[in-house]
Every structure is written in structure tokens, then in C-alpha cells.
């Protein structure tokens, strides 16, 4: 009975995700409408297939779970986006550009999450403290391009904006704007590089 209730809850969540990310309108949910949008709108197909694969992976066994893994491998190859199926992402996911996105399977991410190209949400790989992996990101979080969130345990609050080219390895409070300060350094060479000089001489 408990397992059935959990499955029903997961199915309702799946439908809400597809409503917001694939249908993207106020019409009532129906599978024909979702499938029609997935076929008609190529930019929405990733959301459709990843949500289906995620649901199968987390709620099914045997053939469907293996099918979910195959679907996700194909999505990774086609879109250059690797979101592990263990990741739990609430409705409203927005991927501005797909290339180079990686999200670890331990991530738990809230509603209306926006992520951009060449961004990684991952773990250190060493975990010297041996504590359980926990990557938690709140609601209404936006991450700029070319950013990295790397930690074995981290909490990012609600309504956080992370600027492009940021490195995050510490907790962030609610309602914060975060950037990693960068310094542009330009030096003028005193001599012409050897490889360019040899080309000009020839």
C-alpha cells in the first residue's frame, strides 16, 4: 500500500514536470498533448525523455530501469548534457544551452531551476570525511555559464543567482547573488614567439 502511494505521488510529479517543461501552457494534462508537444517542439524533447527516464529509473525495476539508462546514455550523446538519473529535480527545469552540462546523481534541486552551458554540479571524488553525499539546491536558483559547484555536502538556498564563471564549494544563503571575482592580466611580450618568427622567415 505504501509503495503504491509513493508510485502514485511520483507519477503526479512526473505529470507536473511534463506540464511545465513540455506542454508549457495552462491546458489540463494529457498524454496525447504532451507527446504532441514533444514531437512538434524539438527543444522540449530532452525534457520529455529525461523525465520519463528519471521516473522509470527511480520507480521501476528490470527492463524499464535498464531502458531508462539506455535513454539517458543516448540523451548524453545527442545533447552533450549528462544529468544522472539519480538526481531529483523538481518541476520547472530550464536548460538555456545544453552543451557541457553535468549534474551528479546525488543532487536534490528545487522548483524553477535554470542552468546554462558548460556547468558542473558534482562532488570532489575524495570525500575524506566519509559523510553521506548531499548536494541540495533550493527553489528559483539560476546558474550562469561555465560555472562549477563542487562539494560533497553543500546547501544552496532559495532565490540564489550564481554569475557566469563562478566556482562554488560552500553553502549559499537564501536571496543571494554570487560571483567569483576574476582579474584580467595582460602582459606584452618583449620578443616575437619563436614559432611565429620561423613562419615569417620562411
Q: Where are the regions a protein language model picked out?
A:
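Right-handed parallel beta-helix
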Residues: 127-130
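Terminal amphipathic alpha-helical/low-complexity segments used for targeting or macromolecular assembly
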Residues: 1-79, 190-202
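Left-handed beta-helix
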Residues: 79, 85, 90-91, 96-105, ...
Amino acid at each position: 500500500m505504501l509503495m503504491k502511494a509513493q508510485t502514485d505521488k511520483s507519477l503526479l510529479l512526473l505529470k507536473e514536470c511534463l506540464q511545465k517543461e513540455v506542454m508549457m501552457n495552462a491546458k489540463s494534462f494529457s498524454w496525447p498533448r504532451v507527446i504532441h508537444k514533444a514531437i512538434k517542439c524539438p527543444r522540449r524533447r530532452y525534457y520529455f525523455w529525461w523525465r520519463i527516464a528519471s521516473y522509470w529509473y527511480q520507480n521501476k525495476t528490470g527492463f524499464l530501469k535498464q531502458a531508462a539508462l539506455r535513454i539517458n546514455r543516448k540523451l548524453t550523446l545527442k545533447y552533450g548534457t549528462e544529468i544522472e538519473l539519480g538526481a531529483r529535480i523538481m518541476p520547472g527545469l530550464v536548460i538555456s544551452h545544453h552543451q557541457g552540462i553535468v549534474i551528479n546523481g546525488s543532487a536534490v534541486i528545487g522548483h524553477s531551476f535554470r542552468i546554462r552551458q558548460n556547468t558542473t554540479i558534482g562532488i570532489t571524488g575524495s570525500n575524506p570525511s566519509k559523510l553521506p553525499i548531499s548536494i541540495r539546491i533550493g527553489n528559483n536558483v539560476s546558474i550562469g555559464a561555465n560555472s562549477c559547484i563542487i562539494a560533497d555536502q553543500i546547501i544552496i538556498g532559495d532565490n540564489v543567482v550564481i554569475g557566469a564563471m563562478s566556482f562554488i564549494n560552500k553553502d549559499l544563503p537564501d536571496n543571494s547573488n554570487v560571483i567569483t571575482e576574476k582579474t584580467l592580466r595582460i602582459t606584452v611580450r618583449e620578443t616575437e614567439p619563436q614559432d611565429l618568427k620561423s613562419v615569417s622567415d620562411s
